[in-house]
Amino acid sequence: GGLGIEVGMEDGFVLVISPIEDTPAYKAGLKSGDLIMKLDSTAVKGLTLNDAVKLMRGKPGSTITLQVLRKGVNAPFDLKVTRAQIKTKSVKAKLVEPNYAYIRVTQFQEKTGEDLAKSLKKLRAENKFAFNGIILDMRNNPGGLLNSSVAVSAAFLKEGDLVVYTEGRAPDSKMNLTTSPENFVRNNPEKNNFLKDLPADIKDTPMVVLINNGSASASEIVAGALQDHKRALIVGTRSFGKGSVQSIMPMNNGTAIKLTTARYFTPNGRSIQGKGIVPDIVVEDGLSAIAVRESDLNNILSNPEDDEKKLKDAPEKPAKVKSVPTSDGQEALRNFKPIKLGGKDDKQFLEALNILKGIDLYKKN
């Protein structure tokens, strides 16, 4: 059993990149950017990430107490989490209203592209007519498999469109990934292309993509590709900014070294690393003032565009959010109620739906 979080290391502590939806960590109130200082009575300082992850795992139903340090909270606080078998559904889909589809992608797993295609076809048949709008929700999506992110992008872009490319010092670190089936179907791409039967109108349906500071890596690749090709409006808050490629180098003594060997770039040449994806329309979720991103971390891989005055074809960076007063961590937990994403209390989702309705009204007039 586990907790259901994507993690890294920062200053010797475990950094929560994103809690995965519907897992124990998400339900308990862990947030993107939290630092875990203790696992039960064991201090995290001095542990490797693998050692810390092993301590977080355990028998389903058993509990672990995490000591958490959160930006905007004046002292560390304890959070008890009950371990469980982590079985996440990477694609959730529904018609939120007639003619409006909502697709939630929580992670990029092996079957995510295929599940997305099935969901789109099912909703399209249920709706009977072409959609007036599609919302693709990748908030708190920590990433996953690169080929699955290409598949999700390919569902909405034209065949042959560039999704992402990488650049690094080593010649074999350079690659261009387009929406061609061979980049997301492992065996016999032409025969097994699960996107080939998608209704043609899906490619032209107005889209909004929702992101936040918990959207990292593969989800940033999808958002960047759809933004650069002007296929979708990006709504929410700036994403995490994890745009580096890691490679594992085996050593003679049976160990291995994990090295950062390249960076991801969007089709227009923007590096995701440390910058993230900036929304076309910023809609706060009430948590952005205490958000932590890759750019807030120490010793991060630099972005090659840091010295340029402006990112190529990137939207203007939104104004800085005012700092929030510190609060008591336990009080924050007592008041914590997870917002049902895609529900009536989800401000960002409701704004996305209003944007799509506005586009439809404009087209009709």
Which residues does each predicted region cover?
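PDZ/PDZ-like peptide-tail recognition elements
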Residues: 1-18
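A generic structural motif
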Residues: 8, 67-71, 250, 265
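PDZ-domain C-terminal substructure recognizer with occasional recognition of PDZ-binding tails
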Residues: 12-14, 37, 51-92, 260-261
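PDZ/PDZ-like domain micro-motif
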Residues: 21-34, 89-92, 196-197
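Conserved PDZ fold ligand-binding element
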Residues: 25-48, 135-137, 228
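PDZ domains, with a preference for the canonical peptide-binding region formed by the helix
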Residues: 35-67, 148, 242-248
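C-terminal "post-core" interaction segments
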Residues: 91-365
